[in-house]
């Protein structure tokens, strides 16, 4: 059951220089159906009515940018991303504000990290302003999907993948940049409460010179077996160790690690330093900035698992 179609219009926005943003008519679910889904959205289960799509072709650049209906993608079976994992993604959130507006949290940092990840995988980076335009356009179009309940947000997932139909091992010549959104409750089923962690000694997440500091799809596929081990051991998350000595904690399966030593005004924030093998998290960076602004000592260093266990 849907409401009437959104008005068809020619957007005055441009995705990037010379590339207009086309806004299509999008069927929208009824207010009643949307409200029912927002009562208990979970994480990553439901998706908004729209999505953003732009295409890239070598020699032509980014083109065909549009807001369209959320729908399955049509891809060639030989699309390079399906075979060689030339794919990156980001994750950020939009929050309902008391005055009825919607705010995204530090999207410019996601845009910069997304571009850096693209360059690491030999992909054409999405211009940072274009990334922000795409995110803003989707949130504006689907703002009715931003939940207002406690601990609820609109999770936004931009991603880029190699779409060229070609089986040779080289950087693709064609790409898709897509942004989708999903109303979300707490990431963990128990909500915002302490989680139990499992120290992985059998597997590593990333090695020096690899892709550990970018959000590429292959990093997460390779982490799933260790995550299964953690769940089998009754834990919520994996803690990864460094690849060389397997004694320094780096990060968890879905987030960076921080340790608070001491309490009160004397509390110190300790977090593993960015060695190129762990993700430079935006929440991590925000916590460091806030802690320093509050007068706390912040230390970034190689931190052993023995020290973390004390």
Question: Which residues are covered by each model-predicted region?
Answer:
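Short, Gly/Pro- and small/polar-rich lid/capping loops
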Residues: 5-67
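Short acidic-glycine loop/turn motifs at beta-strand connectors
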Residues: 55-62, 95-100, 107, 163, ...
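Short, well-structured beta-strand/strand-turn elements
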Residues: 238, 294-302
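Glycine- and Gly-Pro-enriched alpha-helical subdomains that act as flexible
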Residues: 247-274
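Conserved small/polar residues in nucleotide/adenosyl-binding loops
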Residues: 303-309
């Amino acid at each position: 059951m849907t409401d009437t179609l959104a008005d068809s219009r020619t957007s005055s926005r441009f995705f990037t220089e010379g590339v207009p943003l086309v806004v299509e008519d999008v069927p929208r679910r009824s207010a009643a159906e949307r409200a029912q889904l927002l009562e208990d959205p979970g994480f990553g289960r439901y998706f908004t009515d729209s999505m953003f799509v732009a295409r890239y072709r070598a020699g032509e650049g980014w083109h065909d940018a549009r807001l369209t209906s959320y729908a399955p993608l049509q891809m060639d079976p030989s699309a390079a991303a399906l075979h060689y994992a030339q794919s990156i993604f980001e994750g950020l959130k939009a929050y309902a504000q008391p005055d009825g507006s919607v705010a995204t949290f530090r999207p410019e940092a996601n845009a910069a990290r997304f571009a850096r990840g693209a360059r690491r995988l030999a992909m054409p980076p999405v211009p940072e302003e274009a990334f922000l335009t795409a995110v803003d356009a989707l949130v504006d179009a689907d703002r009715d999907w931003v939940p207002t309940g406690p601990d609820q947000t609109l999770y936004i997932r931009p991603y880029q993948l190699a779409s060229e139909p070609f089986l040779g091992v080289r950087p693709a010549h064609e790409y898709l940049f897509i942004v989708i959104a999903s109303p979300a409750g707490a990431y963990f089923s128990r909500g915002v409460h302490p989680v139990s962690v499992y120290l992985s000694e059998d597997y590593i997440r990333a090695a020096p010179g690899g892709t550990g500091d970018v959000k590429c799809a292959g990093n997460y596929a390779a982490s799933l077996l260790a995550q299964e081990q953690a769940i089998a051991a009754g834990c919520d998350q994996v803690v990864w160790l460094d690849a060389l000595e397997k004694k320094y904690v780096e990060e968890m399966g879905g987030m960076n690690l921080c340790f608070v030593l001491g309490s009160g005004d004397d509390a110190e924030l300790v977090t593993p330093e960015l060695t190129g093998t762990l993700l430079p998290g935006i929440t991590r960076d925000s916590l460091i900035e806030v802690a320093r602004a509050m007068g706390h000592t912040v230390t970034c260093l190689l931190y052993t698992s023995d020290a973390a266990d004390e």
